[in-house]
Amino acid sequence: MSIQVCVTGLVAYLSQKLGVTFYLLGILLCLMVIDYLSGMAASAVEALDHPDDKSYGWSSRKGAKGIAKKVAYLFVIAVGMVIDYVIIQTSGVLGFNLPNTMLSLLVTVWYMLNEALSITENAGRMGAPVPEWLMTVSYTHLRAHETLSD
């Protein structure tokens, strides 16, 4: 059996089991890559703008931390999927049937929005004009995220 057949079978299986979340995970992965690359580019621009300040510029430590954070996103989404599965399986015992739940879907969309805002912030760091209202939304999101992290 060829690798293409195996990959096609796996994609079909995951698509059937995860539904729309499968496609959103694909979009999230693309956003994660774009965010990482735009963060590297923004750091490079800042290093050029501040050549004498070592606090600016790309850092492998920050890069590794960013990758670890993105992997942690996937872990949290996996936990949401497990909780969805448990709710679906136990709902029948409780006397009602749920065809699916949305916890993993909501978590995935939340992380997609987080990545999109981060890409926007990176564009602003590179000097791209960003609408003021969008930066306000981004700042509000950042403050809420910091509050949740504490």
Where do the model's predicted regions map?
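Hydrophobic alpha-helical transmembrane segments of multi-pass integral membrane proteins
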Residues: 2-12, 29, 70-84, 105-115
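Helix-coil boundary and interhelical linker segments in multi-pass alpha-helical membrane proteins
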Residues: 16-23, 89-97
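Hydrophobic alpha-helical membrane-embedded segments
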Residues: 26-39, 113-119
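Membrane-water interface of transmembrane alpha-helices
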Residues: 36-49
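Juxtamembrane inter-helical linkers in multi-pass membrane proteins
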Residues: 48-55, 132-138
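Juxtamembrane helix-capping/reentrant segments at transmembrane boundaries
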Residues: 50-73
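Alpha-helical transmembrane segments and their immediate juxtamembrane interface regions
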Residues: 104-135
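Single conserved hydrophobic/aromatic residue that forms the stacking wall/gate
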Residues: 141-150
